[in-house]
A protein has these predicted regions:
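Catalytic cores of eukaryotic secretory-pathway lumenal/extracellular enzymes that build
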Residues: 1-58
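Lectin-like carbohydrate-binding module/patch detector with strong preference for beta-trefoil
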Residues: 62-200
């Protein structure tokens, strides 16, 4: 019953559905029946769309696929290896090392990131940073977003360059985790944003 209610909410009120399915792929093929009555109710009452709610009631909510907030979103792919940046199923609220894992053939929350207009590689509330306490290993960690420069990156020539250290994001095949390394001409440092608004 809860599944059907969520589906009705999504179809009746939400204007974007892709992000919904990313977090609840189990509902993608749920049969919900005719919802025309609900859509007519919304139109008849002049109900505002979900975007209005985000802009007027909850403006501090980060929307990971909205071009108002992001330059790109989706999988961040290393084309040479076919691997993607991955949370390795870690929880958003936890601090953890970012993984480097074969890209899924389907949308997956563990490989969904956005590159914000503020220069953050981020999930909903966590941002990629270089663990300065681990400069020997140069691991890249997800930590709560704080707006500080330690979480800022530039995306130039398909490279993510950390603003403070000038190190590049690197994925090594056979390595479980991402790292940062001195920038060089190497396919291990090239990345594609799956949905890049700047390329559109």
């Amino acid at each position: 019953m809860v599944s059907i209610q969520l589906e009705l909410l999504k179809f009746g009120w939400m204007t974007t559905k892709d992000f919904f399915y990313l977090n609840r792929p189990d509902l993608k093929n749920t049969e919900i029946g005719d919802i025309q009555e609900r859509l007519d109710f919304r139109k008849e009452k002049g109900c505002k769309p979900f975007k209005w709610f985000l802009e007027n009631v909850y403006p501090q909510k980060y929307v990971p696929d909205d071009p108002t907030y992001v330059l790109g979103y989706g999988r961040i792919i290393n084309p040479k290896s076919g691997n993607c940046i991955d949370t390795l199923q870690n929880e958003e609220k936890d601090e953890y090392d970012l993984g480097f894992y074969p890209c899924h053939s389907f949308s997956s929350a563990s490989q969904f990131f956005s590159f914000s207009r503020k220069g953050e590689i981020r999930g909903e509330e966590s941002c990629a940073t270089i663990d300065l306490g681990e400069m020997r290993t140069h691991k890249v960690r997800m930590t709560p977003c704080n707006g500080l420069s330690i979480q800022k990156w530039e995306y130039v020539g398909n490279r993510f360059i950390h603003k403070d250290t000038r190190l590049c994001l690197e994925g090594i095949v056979g390595g479980e985790f991402l790292r940062s390394a001195p920038c060089k001409i190497s396919s291990s440092q090239l990345w594609i944003l799956e949905n890049d608004y700047e390329e559109s």
